UniProtKB/Swiss-Prot annotation:
The protein, known as: Ipecac alkaloid beta-glucosidase 3
Keywords of this entry: Alkaloid metabolism, Cytoplasm, Glycosidase, Hydrolase
Pfam family, one: Glyco_hydro_1
Residues forming the catalytic site: 186 (proton donor), 422 (nucleophile)
Subcellular location: Cytoplasm, Cytosol
Length: 543
C-alpha cells in the first residue's frame, strides 16, 4: 500500500469540474446490469437465473420482499433509456448480457434463444445509431438456474467450459460492434456473498454483507433449497467454498479471453478487463505497523485476490501464507492463460474503511472468509466516522479513498490502464416524497463532483485512468436491497409504469460532461434539448 503520494502537478477544480478538465478521449458514461433493470423475467424465451429462484424462494431475505421480475422494465423501454443516455451526452453505456436470456438452459447444447440474441442486437444497434459506445459485461451474477441445478454453478469446474461457450456466442453475435468487454463484475463480491449456498450453516453470517444493505439478522428456511450452491460436502467450510468459486471465476475469465484472442481478436479488435470492487483500506492507526500490514492484507483479500493472478499467475503472497492448501494452485497451463489476460482494469469504488490487525481464529474449522485475512474493519475511529453515511448502512462517503485506491493499483499492479466502472451513492427510497422532492439529490451531486475531482488529481499524478462510469444510470432493483435503495442519476417512478425523470445530478452531469463540451474548459453548457431534459413534471419518454 502506498504511504507517500506525489505532489499534485496541476490544481484541481473541485466542484467546478467539467469535461474540459479531461482529455478528449476520456470516456464518461453510466452503467446498469441485466437482472437489475430488464424485468421481463418470463418474456422472450428467457430461462430462470439463480436470482429468480432466490428471490422467489426467500423473499424474506430481500429488504422489501421484492424481486426482479419486472425490475424497471428496461427490456420493453430500452429505446427510452438510450434516449436518456443521448440526452445526457454520455460517451458510453455499460450494460450486461443476461446469460439465461440467450442460453435458457445455460449451455450451448441446451439451445440458443434467438429472441434473446435479437434483443441485444437491437439494443447495441440502437446505442450505435445514437453515437453511444457499448461497454458490455458478460457476467453480472445471473448464473442460469439450469447450471446451478446440474452441477452447483461456480462451485464446479464444469462451469468454465459453459462460460467460455457463452462468451464465444456473445463474441460471434455482438463482437463486430462491441469493442469493450468486461468479463466478470466484482468476482470478489460474487464469491463472498453469492457463490456459496445459503443453506450452508456459516452462510447466515455471510448474508450480513454490509455492501448489500441486508438486515442484521436473517431467518433460515425450513428446508434446504439449492439456490446459490450446494451442501453436497458438509465437511467443507463456507470459506473454502468461497475460494473455490473465486478460482473458477478466474479460470472462466481466462477461458473467455483465450477464445477471443484465438478466434476474434484479429478481426474484431476488442479490449477486455474485469470490474474489481475495492474500498480504500485505511490503517486504523497509521503509526502502528501491525495496522499498516493489516490494511495491506485487506487490500490483497479484496482486490489482489483477482488482480494478482492476472499478473503473476498466483494469488497474493499474504493469501497463500494464511490459507495454505485451502487456496487452490493454478496449473502451469492455467497460469499461461491468466497472465496478461486483460487490457485494462475496471475499478468499482464506493467507500472506505478503517482496518486494524486481528488474531487468527483458534479453530480453523470455524474459519470463515471474513476472518481469514486476520484483520478487522470498522467505519469509525474514536467515535468519529471515516466519512458521513449516505444512509442507514455501509456507504461512508470518502472521496479521497478513490485517489488512494488508484495510486495503490498503479504502484502495486504494474501501472495498468484503469476505467472507473462503478462509482456512485444511494439514497433511501422515501415514498413520502413528492416527485419534485425525490429529484433533489444534492448528496449524489456532491459525491460525484468530489470523486471526479480526486480521479482528475490522480490522473495529474500519472495514474492511467481513462474513463468514468457512474453507477447507475437509473434507479433500479438493487439486489438484496430491492427497491429500498436508489442509486440512479435518473429517478424511476416504481409506482407509475416506471416513468423516468432526471434528478439534479443528471442535469448537472449533462451540463458539465456532455460530449459536445470536449474542447474548452469554460465552454457554455449545451442548449439543444435543454427543456426536454430539464422539465421536472414531464416523463422523458415523451421526448
Amino acid at each position: 500500500m502506498s504511504s507517500v503520494l506525489p505532489t499534485p502537478v496541476l490544481p484541481t477544480p473541485g466542484r467546478n469540474i467539467n469535461r474540459g478538465h479531461f482529455p478528449d478521449d476520456f470516456i464518461f458514461g453510466a452503467g446498469t446490469s441485466s437482472y437489475q433493470i430488464e424485468g421481463a423475467a418470463r418474456e422472450g424465451g428467457r430461462g430462470p437465473s439463480i436470482w429468480d429462484t432466490f428471490t422467489h424462494t426467500h423473499p424474506e431475505l430481500i429488504q422489501d420482499g421484492s424481486n426482479g421480475d419486472t425490475a424497471i422494465n428496461s427490456y420493453n423501454l430500452y429505446k427510452e433509456d438510450i434516449k436518456i443516455v443521448k440526452l445526457m451526452g454520455l460517451d458510453a453505456y455499460r450494460f450486461s448480457i443476461s446469460w439465461p436470456r440467450i442460453l435458457p438452459g445455460g449451455s450451448i447444447n441446451a439451445g440458443i434463444n434467438q429472441e434473446g440474441i435479437k434483443y441485444y442486437n437491437n439494443l447495441i444497434d440502437e446505442l450505435l445509431a445514437n453515437d453511444i459506445v457499448p461497454y458490455v459485461t458478460l457476467f453480472h451474477w445471473d448464473v442460469p438456474q439450469a447450471l446451478q441445478d446440474q452441477y452447483d454453478g461456480f462451485l464446479s469446474d464444469k462451469i468454465v467450459d459453459d462460460f467460455r461457450d457463452f462468451a464465444e456466442l456473445c463474441f460471434w453475435e455482438f463482437g463486430d460492434r462491441v469493442k469493450n468487454w468486461i468479463t466478470i463484475n466484482e468476482p470478489q463480491s460474487y464469491s463472498d456473498f453469492f457463490g456459496v449456498a445459503y443453506d450452508t450453516p456459516p452462510k447466515a453470517h455471510a448474508l450480513k454483507a454490509s455492501r448489500l444493505l441486508v438486515p442484521t439478522t436473517v431467518a433460515r428456511p425450513s428446508k434446504p433449497v439449492r439456490v446459490f450452491a450446494s451442501t453436497a460436502d458438509p465437511g467443507t467450510t463456507t470459506a473454502d467454498q468461497v475460494y473455490k468459486v473465486g478460482h473458477n471465476l478466474l479460470l472462466a475469465h481466462a477461458a473467455a479471453i483465450q477464445v477471443y484472442r484465438d478466434k476474434f481478436q484479429n478481426t474484431q479488435e476488442g479490449t477486455f478487463g474485469m470490474a474489481l470492487v475495492t474500498q480504500w483500506m485505511k490503517p486504523l492507526n497509521e503509526n502502528n505497523p501491525a495496522d499498516v500490514e493489516a490494511a495491506s492484507r485487506a487490500f490483497d483479500f479484496k482486490f489482489g485476490w483477482f488482480m494478482q493472478p492476472l499478473i503473476t499467475g498466483e494469488y497474493p503472497k499474504s493469501m497463500r501464507q494464511l490459507l495454505g492448501p485451502r487456496l487452490r494452485e493454478f496449473t502451469p497451463d492455467q497460469k499461461k492463460l491468466l497472465i496478461g489476460s486483460y487490457d485494462y482494469v475496471g475499478v468499482n469504488y464506493y467507500t472506505a474503511t478503517y482496518v486494524s490487525s486481528a488474531q487468527p481464529p483458534h479453530d480453523k474449522k470455524k474459519a470463515v472468509f471474513h476472518t481469514d485475512g486476520n484483520f478487522y474493519t470498522t467505519d469509525s475511529k474514536d467515535g468519529v466516522l471515516i466519512g458521513p453515511l449516505a444512509g442507514p448502512a455501509w456507504l461512508n462517503i470518502v472521496p479521497e479513498g478513490i485517489y488512494h485506491v488508484l495510486h495503490d493499483i498503479k504502484e502495486n499492479y504494474e501501472d495498468p490502464v484503469i476505467y472507473i466502472t462503478e462509482n456512485g451513492v444511494y439514497e433511501v427510497n422515501d415514498t413520502a416524497k413528492t416527485l419534485s422532492e425525490a429529484r433533489v439529490d444534492t448528496t449524489r451531486l456532491h459525491y460525484l463532483q468530489d470523486h471526479l475531482s480526486k480521479v482528475l488529481e490522480a490522473r495529474h499524478q500519472g495514474v492511467r485512468v481513462q474513463g468514468y462510469l457512474v453507477w447507475s444510470l437509473m434507479d433500479n432493483w438493487e439486489l438484496r436491497a430491492g427497491y429500498t435503495s436508489r442509486f440512479g442519476l435518473i429517478h424511476v417512478d416504481y409506482y407509475n409504469n416506471f416513468a423516468r425523470y432526471p434528478k439534479d445530478s443528471a442535469i448537472w452531469f449533462r451540463n458539465a460532461f456532455h460530449k459536445r463540451l470536449r474542447i474548452h474548459v469554460n465552454k457554455a453548457r449545451p442548449q439543444e434539448d435543454d427543456g426536454a431534459f430539464d422539465t421536472p413534471r414531464k416523463r422523458l419518454r415523451k421526448y
